[in-house]
Swiss-Prot record:
HAMAP family: HslV (MF_00248). Pfam families: Proteasome (PF00227). GO terms for molecular function: metal ion binding; threonine-type endopeptidase activity. The active site is at T7. A double ring-shaped homohexamer of HslV is capped on each side by a ring-shaped HslU homohexamer. The assembly of the HslU/HslV complex is dependent on binding of ATP. It comes from the Bacteria. It is found in: Cytoplasm. Na(+) binds at G165, C168, T171. GO terms for cellular component: HslUV protease complex; proteasome core complex. This is ATP-dependent protease subunit HslV. Belongs to the peptidase T1B family. HslV subfamily. Keywords: Allosteric enzyme, Cytoplasm, Hydrolase, Metal-binding, Protease, Sodium, Threonine protease. GO terms for biological process: proteolysis involved in protein catabolic process. It comes from Bacillus anthracis.
Amino acid sequence: MGNFHATTIFAVHHNGECAMAGDGQVTMGNAVVMKHTARKVRKLFQGKVLAGFAGSVADAFTLFEMFEGKLEEYNGNLQRAAVEMAKQWRGDKMLRQLEAMLIVMDKTTMLLVSGTGEVIEPDDGILAIGSGGNYALSAGRALKQYASEHLTAKQIAKASLEIAGDICVYTNHNIIVEEL
């Protein structure tokens, strides 16, 4: 059986609000949609942190557990937990094989965490990952720049995923949006 992957995750800080959205499609290889309603965005650490994954499903669950453990260990300090997780992820021979990326955020900070040791905080309060990530990122930036006074963070996140779903074959319209 092939690898299960492909998705789009989008996160935004906007006017004091934060939201993260993910689609529900799980694709096996490049040909078969195996699931339409996967939940790839979750609340962690007593509902104070949002995390979303793109990549291999089994790997992502491992990373969710690992990140939540780091959040507990560092008492909810998002940046410290992300840096320590990235160091462990990059430094461990087995963990380096994991094929996934995470976006993690709380009310003040948003970070992209990857297995190559990257922990990146965006300048503009927007991140997107996955196969439709560039489409969602473009849509989100345009919405935030030109319609920001009329839209909430949740509305920007949902609309960005809808636009990505219209373009990317690995992204569907079963969108889950979580807010803090």
